[in-house]
Amino acid sequence: MDLNLRHAVIQNIANNTKEQLEDTIVDAIQRGEEKYLPGLGVLFEEIWKHSSEQQKEEMLTTLEQAVKQHA
């Protein structure tokens, strides 16, 4: 069986509202289980592909600061 993870994740949330999307993200992060990381990666990939250069720069700055706090 060839499971296309990207397609499965997108299909699973395709009709979700903003609030439902937020709940999905927050729940996955709070649970802290590694099994949710691929799905979060797919969501981030979609955010990245649909963001402006300015938004990408802001995300990168935020990410840089966040990872430095954990170093």
Curated annotation (Swiss-Prot):
Its main location: other. It holds the Pfam family SSPI. One of its GO terms (biological process) is asexual sporulation. The keyword Transcription regulation does not apply. It is found in: Spore core. InterPro entries: SspI (IPR017525). Keywords: Sporulation. Induction: Expressed only in the forespore compartment of sporulating cells. NCBIfam families: SASP_sspI. HAMAP family: SspI. Belongs to the SspI family. This is Small, acid-soluble spore protein I. The gene is sspI.
